[in-house]
């Protein structure tokens, strides 16, 4: 069993801490200063220091919490400091004066700013033996005694009390390590024991807070505790012999961290927002503010109280609100909230712990912003009692007046938005009032046309309201009602026909000049004397005319119900009525003539072509009648054959099947194949009836056993129409013109070709030495030409000295050529035929000449030409002496030129 001796001494640190907290609370809170809060840290140790033994904790004040600090020791061989500020022994050594004092450095990792603090270690004083014994008896926890039972097993001695927890105040100032209690076993008299503790705070995170001397069993705390981090530590103490064998069962040690008032209350929000309607009664709930305190809520340190420090503005009362000091509920305590006077209140709220003690409590403040919301306590009022406007007649969607109002309520809220209504002066609903969402003005608009001739002025009574009803007890003043006077302006209106359309019934076939009706228009402008004139706007068949003054409509052609311009027996014509107002206006009217049918169309046979066999059997021809008239001037029809020619009734017979159909058959046993025109008399049922002889073209053909014609030809019309004949003639004429133009063009091209040939071949042309070089075709002949053998004379050499070699195909042969007599004169230019014949004769008489009229290749001629330079040519009139004998070497093409310049006097 364990026991605790000297409880009063154990409570001394707690009482000292409470006294210290009271002094701090009374003195206020000092400003935070970064660095070590102490100038010197002290620790009292025993003679021997073991490796890894925690010695003390140096606390660094990090105000903003953002600094990353690393610690160093001035004696790194003996002491080290972890990141939490706990100082450990690096090695085991006996504590002496040389280790009594050293420095601890703290350096900011980012800014490299550095702080230092001194650490002083002192030896535990050597107390007399009696004093040690007394001290050990006072602060000991003894392991429970164990009795040996008869069976050899240990049995714990029963006790009627348990080990009470150790109460340790947070934020103790030390010195550290601070001794708490001594743990010992009754068996230490006979055995050499070693003590240890386990659990969170010892060998489990956070490690190193509690340490125990393994020899003496002295349990100590190495640093200040923080209840807000860990409120209770649960440790287990162990006792083993030097061999590590357990000699006592572990005992539980509970250390409670006593709360100190070291945390100020903190509001959840620094600014709180709330609303309250204007005109609220006292006691109206507004909002709730809340603060929290990290201290123990079951003690005075965590019990908060609220109060209002100030109110701004202080009108109409400096105490418009109050706060529940325990819950933080803010309520109204005075009447007179008016948004139009004060729209917002700002309250400074204070929360204080220790139940609001002004002496020992810590406090904090926040701001409560209370907005006074609007209610509809101000009706809209017109800025004037009367408004005026004007509008042209027959205009709609026109704003005629702008109504302005004032409202003291909050803009653009239902209590401010105006709604206008017309309470009188508009029984037919011709006006409406819309609200401008931006300006809140009322826009009086015309929604139905107004006729000046009916109403010249309107006096409207209008009222203005809000979208929500007025607050209770508030009435609409007279300023919420006004009058609007609207003047209607007369404008020139369109004349109008009445009725429109106008329908009349007339029989077709009326002769031209018949007066049908009078179609006049009315002018709605009764107060504007004006004249109206009429014109025809649409008359598809051009049957009608209208008198421009009186509007009488007369026919100018025969009305025909069967006209394509008549739809469903109705003919539509449109007329225009125009006045002489400023500006002139016009209106249109439609006259619908319902044409009654008369029997003016004779029936016709349908179909107009048919075919039948040479014998009466096996088929017949079914026919019917087409009549453009309608009942009763159409069917039933009567079908008959004429008496003349007599062959009709002799060859054919017709049988009436019903009122619309009849059957045509051969009367004789055989009729030769061919095309026959059979006249048929068809009579309708009109009054009087109308008859017509209609021709049916019948093709009589040979038939097979099924009664089908074996001929493939069909009935073709006996003749062509005039239009077809004209078209065919035009096509023939166009083709003839095209052929004639082609022939003329061919003849002209032949003449041009002959003229070009004359410029090259004739003997009397002085330009025969000009050749055409635009064709440069060629093959292997010009590629194999030996260019080294080309003659390049600067002057024409005699034939005798010309070297023999490869010659050009167009060069005159070396051997002698026949000489032709020189003609005295060139033929007459007009005698083209003789000129050509003479040229042909001269060419044919030269048996040695190659075919010089063939296509030659002139793609390459060496560095010079046998013709020499043309710039050396001079006429005989120049008087220069020239040698033209070389012209004789150019062949028969240039014989005429050689005769002219080198052949004698001519």
From Swiss-Prot:
Domain Cadherin: 160-267, 268-382, 383-497, 498-603, 604-714
PTM text: Cleaved by MMP24. Ectodomain cleavage leads to the generation of a soluble 90 kDa N-terminal soluble fragment and a 45 kDa membrane-bound C-terminal fragment 1 (CTF1), which is further cleaved by gamma-secretase into a 35 kDa. Cleavage in neural stem cells by MMP24 affects CDH2-mediated anchorage of neural stem cells to ependymocytes in the adult subependymal zone, leading to modulate neural stem cell quiescence. May be phosphorylated by OBSCN.
Major localization class: membrane
Residue ranges crossing the lipid bilayer per the database entry: 725-745
Modified residues (Phosphoserine): 96, 135
Keyword Cell cycle in record: no
GO cellular component, one term: presynaptic active zone membrane
InterPro entries: Cadherin, Cadherin-like_dom, Cadherin-like_sf, Cadherin_CS, Cadherin_pro_dom, Cadherin_Y-type_LIR, Catenin-bd_sf
Signal sequence residues: 1-25
A GO BP annotation: neuronal stem cell population maintenance
One Pfam match: Cadherin
Keywords: Calcium, Cell adhesion, Cell junction, Cell membrane, Cleavage on pair of basic residues, Glycoprotein, Membrane, Metal-binding, Phosphoprotein, Repeat, Signal, Transmembrane, Transmembrane helix
All ranges on the Extracellular side of the membrane: 160-724
Gene3D superfamilies: Cadherins, TCF3-CBD (Catenin binding domain)
Glycosylation sites: 190, 273, 325, 402, 572, 622, 651, 692
Cellular localisation: Cell membrane; Cell membrane, Sarcolemma; Cell junction; Cell surface
Biased composition (Low complexity): 863-880
Record-listed Ca(2+) 2 binding positions: 170, 228, 259-260, 262, 295
Domain description: Three calcium ions are usually bound at the interface of each cadherin domain and rigidify the connections, imparting a strong curvature to the full-length ectodomain. Calcium-binding sites are occupied sequentially in the order of site 3, then site 2 and site 1.
Function: Calcium-dependent cell adhesion protein; preferentially mediates homotypic cell-cell adhesion by dimerization with a CDH2 chain from another cell. Cadherins may thus contribute to the sorting of heterogeneous cell types. Acts as a regulator of neural stem cells quiescence by mediating anchorage of neural stem cells to ependymocytes in the adult subependymal zone: upon cleavage by MMP24, CDH2-mediated anchorage is affected, leading to modulate neural stem cell quiescence.
Subunit structure: Homodimer (via extracellular region). Can also form heterodimers with other cadherins (via extracellular region). Dimerization occurs in trans, i.e. with a cadherin chain from another cell. Interacts with CDCP1. Interacts with PCDH8; this complex may also include TAOK2. The interaction with PCDH8 may lead to internalization through TAOK2/p38 MAPK pathway. Identified in a complex containing FGFR4, NCAM1, CDH2, PLCG1, FRS2, SRC, SHC1, GAP43 and CTTN. May interact with OBSCN (via protein kinase domain 2). Interacts with FBXO45.
Protein name (record): Cadherin-2
